Amino acid sequence: MAEEFGSIDLLGDEDFFFDFDPSIVIDSLPAEDFLQSSPDSWIGEIENQLMNDENHQEESFVELDQQSVSDFIADLLVDYPTSDSGSVDLAADKVLTVDSPAAADDSGKENSDLVVEKKSNDSGSEIHDDDDEEGDDDAVAKKRRRRVRNRDAAVRSRERKKEYVQDLEKKSKYLERECLRLGRMLECFVAENQSLRYCLQKGNGNNTTMMSKQESAVLLLESLLLGSLLWLLGVNFICLFPYMSHTKCCLLRPEPEKLVLNGLGSSSKPSYTGVSRRCKGSRPRMKYQILTLAA
């Protein structure tokens, strides 16, 4: 009777109507039950059930197994979507309250535990999702920062490269100008060297002519000096020797006269002529010897 009473109470719930087995009410009771049981007995049992106290009621009710209740709730959660979880929970709560207060307390605890577990799981999943999102955000931020750093480094490297190229261009231009300047200076030095060499060669030619002129002048002076010396010697010789020659002539003149006087003129003439010729020929020889000694 208690089971039938519980089934009738369950039929009163509209939310739990589709989960209830209607065969209990629809199936007709056998005739033997109707014959054996009278309406008075039924009424008496109902009055006894209503008049008894709570302890007797707890003993009379069939205790539900916690495992069966948890299996039933799990089946409900599996069969129905999450949107109907509230209605299923309400239906389960109603069933437990109808059956027994202790079972209701146990089922309430289990439901609260399940709800807490669900909330914890949901919160854990949300935290995990948040962590994943934060990790993704951190990875994206790191990538962005890395890209920004790479861009900045690339810009700085390009600027340094441009500055280095500009410095090299300036140095190359400066070196080109220096090369041109040094080339011009070298050309000037070469031209100056050639001109100096030409001047030296020209000066050497002038020196040779001057040397030849000087030599000729020296020779001329020497010849003049020699000539003057010879003239002086000649003058001295002429001034000194006429007296001697005159004395010699005076000494030799009386002999031919004497010979002529003695009648020997024919024999004396050749000797006189010879003496005179000898004296005439000796004078230029003496002059020549004096000149050679003076030179």
Swiss-Prot record:
InterPro entries: bZIP, bZIP_sf. GO terms for cellular component: endoplasmic reticulum membrane; nucleus. SMART domains: BRLZ. The keyword Transmembrane applies. The chain crosses the membrane at residues 224-244. Residues 142-162 are annotated as: Basic motif. Residues 106-127 have a biased composition (Basic and acidic residues). One of its GO terms (molecular function) is sequence-specific DNA binding. The keyword DNA-binding applies. Keywords: DNA-binding, Endoplasmic reticulum, Immunity, Membrane, Nucleus, Transcription, Transcription regulation, Transmembrane, Transmembrane helix. Residues 140-203 form the bZIP domain. Pfam families: bZIP_2. SUPFAM superfamilies: Leucine zipper domain. Disruption phenotype: No visible phenotype, but reduced induction of ER stress-responsive genes. Shows enhanced susceptibility to a bacterial pathogen. Residues 168-182 are annotated as: Leucine-zipper. GO terms for biological process: endoplasmic reticulum unfolded protein response; immune system process. Expression and cleavage of bZIP60 in anthers observed in the absence of stress treatment, suggesting that the ER stress response functions in the normal development of active secretory cells. The C-terminal transmembrane domain is cleaved in response to ER stress and the N-terminal fragment containing the bZIP domain is sufficient for transcription activation. Interacts with BZIP28. This is bZIP transcription factor 60.
